[in-house]
């Protein structure tokens, strides 16, 4: 446990750590720095006056124990999550209710099913490609403005079978969701105005009305789809599963009730997937630009599998989506990117009968604590990763005899077990397609030096040696600092 004050708790430790970091560094990054003081990989920290006591863990063993204890999400997460999603969703549900909804959507996110929707994603990436081509006219611009729109369009295309065209023009659904996120605090901000500003309820009410209207219309459209021409979208598959379940149990639940209950699930797919996939794509470009030898290898793999002409990649994928399963080095690049820059973590609520046993045999009670598996600390723990700070995609391709081989349970970008991220297959698919359709067409390089000359900083602007550090910008998400200012140049 960090040094404790009877008057201020651990606030002094937090303040001291924050002072040496950028003002918008994520709480994950702050806790990573604190966690490096504790070799056991488990410590307690009192978050007064913002929260209670947290147990922070960064070992595979402790993370696995937390997963198996089946702890619930704490109130400090459930409330803001349900504010964003408009009600209980798979992210905040527990027990039998969660099992029901997870079972309903599992078939739609099955790897064998989701890869069949790859052509939808290629169409959205083609629009992203055109946006990059426009951006390569010499100006420095924040790439996040494009990647977030790409992920929103891709998710809606796959889940709802609808094209928002948010990459071309602001769409009301995406705009309302962004406003909802911006006006929701996840307890990671220390700004009291952002926490307690009284106009918030009115803004949230309006956003909910907009999103419910649009999502309700899409569910109605799925209901009207002719049975002989069924849509392949995730929502259509879930609707068919729901109707079959109702018929088999003689239930009288109406479609109106399904529409009301399913809306938060659809919102959570957008909320959970938009920033995480967007930031991972950006960090892939960032790391590839820093490691030309890795960039050469991934481009060579794409040429071998998708053909010599990069412009034909989309057509090749549409003709044979299974080609995407023949890109092991690309997958390794993505997994290594997620190791160095995991976009999220996992927090649960402790209980009296739940203890975590450390690797030294010491018992750590969880009662009265929010138990946080700090993924970024686990991924940067040198006890479990050889050359921990180096970007080495090959570690995902070697055998168990190699020192680089990952320790079981040490990589938790999507968590493990029944409550692992349901959208991980979609995220990995979208990332493979985006890299396959862009990395040979463009050189995407960070332009922080130019950006900083125009926007001089008064505080530190690096975390762990990276100018492209993970930054806080609403809803506890880990964004790329300053939206990743870059230059895009089309390759000859």
Swiss-Prot record:
It holds the Pfam family p450. One of its GO terms (biological process) is aflatoxin biosynthetic process. Pathway: Mycotoxin biosynthesis; aflatoxin biosynthesis. Its cofactor is heme. One of its GO terms (molecular function) is heme binding. Cytochrome P450 monooxygenase; part of the gene cluster that mediates the biosynthesis of aflatoxins, a group of polyketide-derived furanocoumarins, and part of the most toxic and carcinogenic compounds among the known mycotoxins. The four major aflatoxins produced by A.parasiticus are aflatoxin B1 (AFB1), aflatoxin B2 (AFB2), aflatoxin G1 (AFG1) and aflatoxin G2 (AFG2). Within the aflatoxin pathway, with the versicolorin reductase aflM, the cytochrome P450 monooxygenase aflN is involved in conversion of VERA to demethylsterigmatocystin (DMST). This is Cytochrome P450 monooxygenase aflN. Disulfide bonds: none annotated. Keywords: Heme, Iron, Metal-binding, Monooxygenase, Oxidoreductase. It comes from the Eukaryota. Signal peptide: none annotated. Heme binds at residue 421. Its EC number is 1.14.-.-. It is an enzyme of class 1 (oxidoreductase). Belongs to the cytochrome P450 family.
């Amino acid at each position: 446990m960090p040094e404790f004050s009877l008057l201020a708790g651990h606030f002094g430790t937090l303040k001291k750590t924050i002072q040496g970091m950028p003002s918008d560094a994520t709480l994950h990054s702050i806790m990573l720095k604190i966690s490096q003081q504790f070799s056991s990989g488990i410590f307690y920290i009192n978050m007064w006056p913002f929260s209670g006591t947290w147990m922070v863990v960064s070992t595979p063993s402790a993370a696995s124990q937390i997963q198996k204890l089946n702890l619930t999400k704490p109130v400090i997460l459930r409330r803001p999550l349900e504010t964003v999603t408009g009600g209980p969703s798979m992210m905040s549900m527990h027990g039998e209710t969660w099992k029901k909804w997870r079972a309903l959507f599992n078939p739609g996110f099955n790897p064998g099913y989701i890869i069949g929707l790859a052509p939808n994603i290629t169409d959205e990436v083609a629009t992203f490609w055109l946006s990059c081509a426009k951006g390569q006219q010499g100006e420095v611009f924040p790439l996040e403005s494009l990647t977030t729109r790409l992920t929103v369009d891709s998710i809606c295309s796959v889940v709802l079978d609808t094209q928002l065209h948010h990459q071309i023009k602001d769409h009301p659904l995406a705009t309302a969701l962004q406003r909802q996120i911006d006006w929701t605090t996840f307890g990671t901000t220390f700004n009291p105005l952002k926490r307690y500003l009284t106009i918030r309820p009115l803004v949230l009410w309006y956003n909910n009305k907009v999103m419910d209207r649009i999502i309700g219309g899409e569910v109605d459209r799925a209901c009207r789809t002719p049975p002989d021409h069924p849509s392949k979208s995730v929502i259509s598959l879930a609707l068919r599963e729901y109707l079959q379940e109702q018929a088999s149990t003689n239930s009288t639940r109406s479609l109106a009730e399904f529409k009301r209950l399913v809306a938060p699930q659809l919102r959570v797919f957008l909320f959970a997937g938009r920033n995480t996939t967007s930031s991972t794509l950006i960090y892939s470009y960032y790391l590839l630009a820093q490691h030309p030898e890795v960039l050469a290898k991934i481009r060579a793999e794409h040429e071998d599998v998708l053909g010599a002409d990069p412009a034909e990649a989309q057509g090749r994928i549409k003709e044979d989506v299974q080609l995407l399963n023949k890109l092991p080095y690309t997958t390794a690049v993505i997994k290594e990117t997620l190791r160095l820059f995991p976009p999220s973590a996992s927090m649960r609520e402790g209980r009296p009968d739940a203890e975590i046993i450390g690797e030294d045999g010491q018992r750590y009670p969880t009662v009265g604590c929010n138990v946080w598996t700090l993924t970024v600390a686990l991924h940067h723990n040198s006890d479990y990763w050889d050359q921990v700070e180096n970007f080495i995609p090959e570690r995902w391709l070697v055998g168990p005899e190699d020192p680089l081989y990952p320790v079981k349970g040490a990589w938790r970008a999507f968590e493990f077990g029944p409550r692992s991220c349901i959208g991980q297959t979609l995220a990995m698919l979208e990332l493979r397609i985006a890299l396959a359709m862009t990395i040979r067409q463009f050189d995407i390089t960070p332009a922080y030096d130019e950006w900083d000359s125009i926007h001089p900083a008064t505080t530190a602007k690096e975390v762990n040696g990276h100018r492209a550090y993970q930054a806080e910008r609403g809803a506890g998400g880990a964004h790329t600092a300053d939206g990743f200012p870059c230059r895009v140049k089309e390759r000859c």
